[in-house]
Regions:
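Peri-transmembrane interface segments
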Residues: 223, 235, 249-283
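A short amphipathic helical element positioned immediately N-terminal to and/or at the very start
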Residues: 2-14, 86, 90
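Generic structural signal for small/hydrophobic residues in well-ordered secondary structure
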Residues: 16, 44, 62, 90, ...
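Short helix-coil transition/hinge motifs at the ends and kinks of transmembrane helices
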Residues: 68-76, 194, 247-252, 355-373
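Transmembrane alpha-helical interface segments in multi-pass membrane proteins
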Residues: 5, 14, 18-26, 33, ...
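Short cytosolic juxtamembrane segments of multi-pass membrane proteins
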Residues: 3-7, 398-413
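Hydrophobic, regular-secondary-structure patches
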Residues: 42-120, 127-130, 163, 211-212, ...
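Mid-to-C-terminal secondary-structure elements
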Residues: 126-142, 146, 151-249
Length: 413
C-alpha cells in the first residue's frame, strides 16, 4: 500500500515537473536558511566557549573590599586586606584548589629607548601562567628559579610588546620599569580584548621582584584554579574560610568579591539558548513561506485532478486513501527539497569558512572568529521544523481532495 502511494506521488510529480521543481527549490532554500541560522548560533556559542577557555574556565579571582554587614564584632565598612597568610590558609583548608597565586598590581612607567608608556605591571607566582592560561608566543614565562632569585625579568603581553618594540624582536632586550632595568624573556599570545580593556598591555614580573617596585605585603587579589565541577559549592567554601579569618559575614558580597569564569559561562549559556530559539523562529518563518508555496501548488494539483479523484472514488477508493496520497506527495516534495537544502547549507558553510562579525567589535579576537557549525542536533531540529511545515501545508489540500463528492467531481471539466 505504501509503495503504491509513493509511486503515485512520484508519478504526479513527474507530470507536474515544473511546479514540483519550483516548490522543491523553495523548500530547499527555506531549510537551508534554518540550518544556517542554527549553525550560526552554534558557531557563536563555540566561539564564546573558546574565548572563555583562553582565560581558564575553572578559574576564580578573589578581590578584597569593604564589609556592608556587621559580623564577628566588626562594624560595617571595615576594609579587608589580603596577605600571603591568606594564600596559605586557602591552600591548606580548601583542597579543591589545584593552583593558587597572590597578585599585586601597579601602574608603572615603562621605557624602551625613546618610547615611554604607562602600563600595568603585575607580580604573580610562576603558576599564574597555568591559572590564567598565559601562552608565550615567543620566549618563555618566568619560573621558580627567577622567583627565588628575585630576578629582574619581565614577560610582555602582545600589545605592550607592539607599542614598545613595534615589529622588532623583544626577547633579550631590556626595558625600564619605574627606572629599574628588566630583561624581556617572553612575549604572550594575544587574548580577547574588548574596547579599551588593557589585558594585552599588562607586563608580568615575579612576585618577589615586584617588591622592588611596590609594597607586596598586602595583596590586590588572589587567583586560583580548581578541578571540581561544583564551582558554587567551592565559592561557598572559600567565603566561609575567608570569613572566619577576616571576621565578616560569608554572604557579604561587598566584603569579598569572587569572580568566577564558570558563573559567566552559565549566564552566557542562557543567553545563547534564547538567541538560538530566536534564530530558529526566523528560519521557521522563512521555511513557512516555502510551505505556503507548497500548499498553493498542491491546491492547484487538486483542482487539476478533480475528475481523476472522482473516478477513483467511484471505483472504490476510500477517503483516507485519497488523503494519504496527496499528503504523501507533499511530504515527498518537502523531503527532496529538505535534502537539497541541507546539501546547500553544507556547501555554504564550507565555502564561507570563518566569519569575523564578532572580531570586528573586538581587538585580538582570533578566538572569537565564528564558524558555521552544523551538528546532528541542528539537523534534527531542522528536520522536525520541515516535517511540521510540510504536514501543515500538505494537510489542507489533502483534506480538500479527500472530501470531494465523487458525483460532483466526475461532472468537473
Amino acid at each position: 500500500m505504501l509503495t503504491d502511494t509513493l509511486h503515485e506521488a512520484w508519478t504526479a510529480m513527474r507530470y507536474n515537473r515544473r511546479s514540483a521543481a519550483l516548490t522543491m527549490l523553495a523548500m530547499a532554500w527555506g531549510i537551508a536558511t534554518v540550518v544556517l541560522l542554527l549553525a550560526y548560533g552554534n558557531g557563536c556559542a563555540q566561539a564564546m566557549i573558546n574565548i572563555f577557555a583562553s582565560f581558564g574556565t575553572k578559574t576564580m579571582i578573589l578581590v578584597p573590599g569593604r564589609t556592608s554587614m556587621q559580623a564577628g564584632g566588626q562594624k560595617a565598612g571595615a576594609a579587608l586586606r589580603f596577605t600571603l597568610d591568606d594564600v596559605d590558609l586557602l591552600r591548606m583548608n580548601v583542597p579543591q584548589i589545584s593552583r593558587i597565586t597572590p597578585e599585586v598590581y601597579k601602574s608603572s612607567t615603562i621605557q624602551y629607548e625613546s618610547r615611554t608608556f604607562n602600563f600595568g605591571v603585575v607580580g604573580d607566582h610562576p603558576n599564574v601562567a597555568s591559572i590564567r592560561v598565559l601562552v608565550p608566543a615567543q620566549g618563555r614565562f618566568y619560573n621558580i628559579e627567577d622567583q627565588l632569585q628575585r630576578a629582574r625579568v619581565a614577560v610582555l603581553s602582545s600589545e605592550a610588546k607592539e607599542k614598545l618594540f613595534s615589529g622588532r624582536n623583544a626577547q633579550g632586550e631590556c626595558i625600564r620599569i619605574d627606572g629599574l632595568s628588566f630583561e624581556v624573556i617572553g612575549v604572550l599570545s594575544a587574548k580577547m580584548q574588548e574596547g579599551d580593556d588593557d589585558i594585552n598591555r599588562i607586563i608580568y614580573v615575579p612576585f618577589t621582584t615586584m617588591g622592588d617596585l611596590t609594597d607586596i605585603h598586602f595583596l590586590d587579589s588572589i587567583g586560583f584554579n580548581y578541578e571540581v565541577n561544583d564551582y558554587q559549592g567551592l565559592e561557598r567554601a572559600v567565603r566561609a574560610v575567608m570569613a572566619i579569618q577576616h571576621k565578616f559575614n560569608p554572604v557579604d558580597r561587598h566584603a569579598l568579591s569572587v569572580y568566577s569564569v564558570m558563573d559567566q559561562i552559565r549566564q552566557f549559556r542562557g543567553m545563547v539558548l534564547g538567541f538560538k530559539i530566536l534564530l530558529a523562529l526566523i528560519g521557521t518563518i522563512t521555511l513557512a513561506t516555502g510551505g505556503v508555496g507548497l500548499m498553493n501548488i498542491m491546491l492547484v494539483s487538486v483542482a487539476q485532478r478533480t475528475h481523476e479523484i472522482g473516478m477513483e472514488k467511484a471505483l472504490g477508493s476510500r477517503q483516507r486513501d485519497v488523503f494519504f496520497r496527496f499528503l504523501t506527495e507533499a511530504l515527498t516534495i518537502s523531503f527532496i527539497g529538505g535534502v537539497l537544502g541541507v546539501m546547500l547549507a553544507y556547501a555554504i558553510a564550507h565555502s564561507v569558512g570563518r566569519l569575523t562579525l564578532y572580531s570586528a567589535m573586538a581587538k585580538h579576537a582570533e578566538a572569537g572568529d565564528i564558524r558555521l557549525l552544523i551538528d546532528p542536533g541542528t539537523l534534527v531540529i531542522a528536520g522536525l521544523i520541515l516535517t511540521a511545515v510540510a504536514l501543515v501545508s500538505g494537510m489542507v489540500p489533502a483534506i480538500r481532495a479527500s472530501r470531494l463528492d465523487p458525483i460532483e467531481a466526475l461532472r468537473y471539466e
